[in-house]
Every structure is written in structure tokens, then in C-alpha cells.
Amino acid sequence: MPGQQRRGGGSGGNEGGRRDNRREGGRGNAPVEKTPHLERVVAINRVAKVVKGGRRFSFTALVIVGDGDGTVGVGYGKAKEVPAAIAKGVEEAKKHFFKVPRIGQSIPHPVQGEDAAGVVLLKPASAGTGVIAGGPVRAVLECAGIHDVLSKSLGSSNPINIVHATVAALKGLESPEAVASRRGLPVEDVAPAAMLASRAEVAS
């Protein structure tokens, strides 16, 4: 009997060890791909498709991806599982990266963006102000590397509309050099002195 107990105990221990090994080699310690980008999941929704046999459920994910240094993109993923939907959203966002003109950690000038029923107003702010914005707008701005800005949502409260309106606003921004080139004037004539001083301070 004692021998059987030892064998049983040994067997249980080995099996437990195998379980632990499987657990250690499973998802918990699986190598995770590190990315230099910031990722924010703004919204996850469950959607249903009615088919002959009933309803098929899937998930959609609205994802913001940026490098925190002036580049940002928005993606929308759909899959049967939430992680897969998020992964698709991330890949979609990376395909739609665009550059955002900045002055320090703020924006060059006030701008308003519209998309569907979403309307978002952005205004530059002094250093140390922070991001004064709601969740969807904040996610886009932080991923773009904008940390001092005032914002207000003037339209729909739908996160998708707000995000796309914010993107439209950011795409409407122009750097002082772009404005000066378009008008055929020197930068000093189109940019406020405070803006030029702020840029010089950041550069130094």
C-alpha cells in the first residue's frame, strides 16, 4: 500500500508537473510581440447577422494606433472573437497612418473637424494644460503625441463619429511653413510671435 501511495503520489506529481509545463509554455508565457506604437481601444460592439439557422454573432473594435510623436491612425476590425477584432483594427490603423503638425506638444491653430454627425473643435493650449478632452478624443490626441490641447464635442456622442471627426480636425491642421508657402510669405508674417518663440524653445 505505501508503495502504491508513493506511485500514486509520484504519478500525480508528474502529471501536475506536466500541467504546469503546459501552462508555462501556453499563453501565459508565450512570447509577446513588442510594438513601439501606442494602442487604444475606443469601442467594442457585438453585432449579429441573421442567417437561415439563426443568428451569428461577431465583434467589432475601433482602435487608435500612434507613435506618440506626430503619427496616428484609426482602424476598425471585425471578427468572431474580441482579440481578433482588435488585432484587425490595429493592422487597419497602421495602414492609415498620417502625420499631425505640432508646435511643441500642442497644435498650431484652432481647427474644427466634422464627420457624419460628429463635430469636434480643437484649440491649442499652453504647456502644462494637459489634454482637456473626452475619452474618444483623448485617445486620438494622446496617440498622436498632443498633450496640451482644449477640445469640445459639438455633435453626436457616438464614439465612432467623434473619433472620425477628431481625425478630420487633425488632418485640417497646417504647419506655419505650409501656410507661408501657400501665401508666398515668410513664416514670420503668418505665425504669431508666441508660436515662433515656443518652437524655438522646444528646438533648443
Curated annotation (Swiss-Prot):
* Region feature Disordered, mapped onto this chain: 1-34
Q: Where is the composition biased (Basic and acidic residues)?
A: 16-26
Tell me which Gene Ontology terms the entry assigns under biological process: translation
Q: Could you name the domain of life of the organism this protein comes from? A: Bacteria
**Keywords from the UniProt entry:** Ribonucleoprotein, Ribosomal protein, RNA-binding, rRNA-binding
Q: Name one Pfam family in it.
A: Ribosomal_S5
Cite a single GO MF annotation: structural constituent of ribosome
Cited PROSITE patterns? RIBOSOMAL_S5 (PS00585), S5_DSRBD (PS50881)
Q: Name one GO cellular component term.
A: small ribosomal subunit
Instruction: Specify residue ranges for compositional bias: Gly residues.
Output: 1-15
Sequence ranges assigned to domain S5 DRBM in this UniProt record: 37-100
Q: What is known of its domains?
A: The N-terminal domain interacts with the head of the 30S subunit; the C-terminal domain interacts with the body and contacts protein S4. The interaction surface between S4 and S5 is involved in control of translational fidelity.
Summarize the subunit comment: Part of the 30S ribosomal subunit. Contacts proteins S4 and S8.
Give the family per the record. Answer: Belongs to the universal ribosomal protein uS5 family.
Function (record text) = With S4 and S12 plays an important role in translational accuracy. Located at the back of the 30S subunit body where it stabilizes the conformation of the head with respect to the body.
Under the heading NCBIfam families, the entry gives:
rpsE_bact
Q: What is this protein called?
A: Small ribosomal subunit protein uS5
Name the encoding gene, please. Answer: rpsE
